[in-house]
From Swiss-Prot:
Enzyme class: transferase
Known partners and oligomeric status: The RNAP catalytic core consists of 2 alpha, 1 beta, 1 beta' and 1 omega subunit. When a sigma factor is associated with the core the holoenzyme is formed, which can initiate transcription.
Coiled-coil stretches noted in the UniProt entry, renumbered to this chain: none
Name of the protein this chain belongs to: DNA-directed RNA polymerase subunit omega
Pfam hit, one: RNA_pol_Rpb6
Organism: Tropheryma whipplei (strain TW08/27)
Amino acid sequence: MEEDRGIADPPLDSLLSRSGSKYGLVIYAAKRARQIDQYYIDLHEGSFYAHVGPLVSVDADDKSLTVAMREIAEDKLDLKSSAAE
């Protein structure tokens, strides 16, 4: 039996501990989600990949924002370096 997931998986509280603010977390996750979307567009078109694909395992029905948040939760991304940009 599959474990029930909440509305936000991973929980937002655990993600906030990795970011200095809610605003920073939202901006960073949204940027990463757009990169993931663009990766799949490039993959479909057969063009050169300008973006890195998902760094975590992905199910077919996962949205790019969910994938981005899971990457943050699993420490696959460094939020500190993006704050300087």
